[in-house]
């Protein structure tokens, strides 16, 4: 390609590698095989009780090591696995990418399990005040990193050797 911009002078983007995780599986091959075979990734929701909900099925990814460890851990595992697959497919190493990192991530929040853990760390007060009292205890320090907006992108940037400040976009 002799020209690196399109007719409106925008940079041309070429996809050279792809990484995929869906409720059907991990990797482009597993997903393509499942889709081609007509399999569905829709199944009963198991992450939380659905007794009083109208929707009880979903296409959740609940088979990864981090699937029950909260949204930040799951987001990191999915991003790391898909980036590794995409870089391998593109023929690039995964330790010195050399380019910028742009990450689309879900909102950063504590899982309900984590909130209940923080609440149980204290016996002082009630409600939100008790949760906050638990959150400042030394044994709660691990929750801090997982709830920082850019922490997942920072870890990915370190893992893949990207350049510049990583950028995270969230809904």
What is the predicted function of each stretch?
Residues 1-166:
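Conserved "HGTGT" condensation-loop signature of ketosynthase/thiolase-family condensing enzymes
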Residues 168-171:
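Short beta->alpha junction loops
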């Amino acid at each position: 390609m002799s020209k690196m911009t399109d007719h409106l002078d925008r940079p041309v983007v070429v996809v050279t590698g792809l990484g995929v995780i869906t409720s059907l599986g991990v990797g482009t091959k597993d997903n393509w095989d499942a889709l081609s075979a007509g399999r569905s990734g829709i199944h009963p929701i198991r992450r939380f009780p659905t007794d009083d909900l109208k929707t009880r099925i979903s296409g959740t990814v609940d088979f990864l090591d981090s699937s029950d460890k909260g949204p930040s851990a799951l987001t990191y595992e999915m991003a790391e696995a898909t980036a590794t697959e995409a870089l391998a497919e593109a023929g690039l190493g995964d330790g010195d990418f050399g380019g910028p990192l742009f990450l689309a991530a879900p909102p950063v929040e504590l899982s309900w399990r984590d909130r209940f853990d923080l609440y149980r760390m204290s016996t002082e007060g009630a409600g939100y005040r008790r949760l906050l009292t638990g959150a400042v205890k030394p044994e709660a320090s691990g929750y801090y990193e997982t709830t920082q907006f850019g922490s997942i992108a920072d870890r990915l940037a370190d893992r893949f050797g990207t350049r510049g400040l990583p950028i995270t976009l969230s809904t």
